Amino acid sequence: MYHSSSQKRHWTFASEEQLARLRADANRKFKCKAVANGKVLPNDPVFLEPHEELTLCKYYEKRLLEFCSVFKPAMPRSVVGTACMYFKRFYLNNSVMEYHPRIIMLTCAFLACKVDEFNVSSPQFVGNLRESPLGQERALEQILEYELLLIQQLNFHLIVHNPYRPFEGFLIDIKTRYPMLENPEILRKTADDFLSRIALTDAYLLYTPSQIALTAILSSASRAGITMESYLSESLMLKENRTCLSQLLDIMKSMRNLVKKYEPPRSDEVAVLKQKLERCHSSDLALNAVTKKRKGYEDDDYVSKKPKQEEEEWTDDDLVDSL
């Protein structure tokens, strides 16, 4: 259960400000480590600032979600959600300048398949990469090399509670105990869209899965012109607890605001930041702590098998929708 889980105890935070402090601290610690090795000065322009790291994390997180969306065989949503949560957690306490998000995102997806018992072999997994057989072999080597590191940085807290199960539970409850809404299934598509959008925000690190699921349903109802506050007050028995009801409504409002204010990284900004990132990981600087024993990816041209022709803003190394 979520309320007795490591997710609640260790990976659910009080505010966006707390998340920002953790990320800034990870950035500062890496800079101190890099300066200590004598290869760079404290104010060297090679360093990424915390807000630049966050932009890159957003970019690679979106690519992770898109990679999972075109994965063959189809990847269950719970696996996608788990991979996304691993990625968010990892970069709360680590810098992209030390561990490249390109390989971390794949390692997150690979580990999520194992933990959620999605039966995919290693060759099947890397077979989803737009790479030659040799490139796929190298990718698998790096994934396996980073897997233990990822597990350690997650503090061995591998069970993730996603909002998808409580979402289905709420729909069943509405069908059973809320006759005012004749066909709750009409809410599903818009609610699914909301869950997809909120996965790109920090909501998974701030709110409970059931709060996210309920917000998705009520947001969908609101967009359809359906008022469901009586479901909260009557069916969920919050009528007598106005304080709890008010707090829940505030939480849902905060989540909707997270979705509204989310801005995807601009392609021109990402291009500049990726150049800085590759500079941090170049062999002459060697800022990253993990010694690369094997050759890994030298670019991002690996994420699916067919380029998406209709989106001109994507370059040929971007994640694409295929099939």
UniProtKB/Swiss-Prot annotation:
Oligomeric and partner information: Associates primarily with CDK7 and MAT1 to form the CAK complex. CAK can further associate with the core-TFIIH to form the TFIIH basal transcription factor.
Compartments, record wording: Nucleus
Tissue: Expressed in both the germinal and somatic cells of the testis.
Residue(s) carrying Phosphoserine: S5, S132, S304, S322
Entry keywords, A to Z: Cell cycle, Cyclin, Nucleus, Phosphoprotein, Transcription, Transcription regulation
Compositional bias segments (type: Acidic residues): 310-323
Disulfide bridge partners, by residue number: none
Cellular component terms (Gene Ontology): CAK-ERCC2 complex; cyclin-dependent protein kinase holoenzyme complex; male germ cell nucleus; transcription factor TFIIH core complex; transcription factor TFIIH holo complex; transcription factor TFIIK complex
One MF term in the entry's GO annotations: RNA polymerase II general transcription initiation factor activity
InterPro entries, alphabetized: Cyclin-like_dom, Cyclin-like_sf, Cyclin/Ssn8, Cyclin_C_2, Cyclin_N, CyclinH/Ccl1
Residue positions, PTM Phosphothreonine: T315
Gene3D superfamilies documented for this protein: Cyclin-like
Any single GO BP term: transcription initiation at RNA polymerase II promoter
Keyword hit for Transmembrane: no
Cell cycle as UniProt keyword: yes
Function, in words: Regulates CDK7, the catalytic subunit of the CDK-activating kinase (CAK) enzymatic complex. CAK activates the cyclin-associated kinases CDK1, CDK2, CDK4 and CDK6 by threonine phosphorylation. CAK complexed to the core-TFIIH basal transcription factor activates RNA polymerase II by serine phosphorylation of the repetitive C-terminal domain (CTD) of its large subunit (POLR2A), allowing its escape from the promoter and elongation of the transcripts. Involved in cell cycle control and in RNA transcription by RNA polymerase II. Its expression and activity are constant throughout the cell cycle.
Listed name of the protein: Cyclin-H
Origin superkingdom: Eukaryota
Renumbered residue ranges of the record's region Disordered: 295-323
Protein family (similarity comment): Belongs to the cyclin family. Cyclin C subfamily.
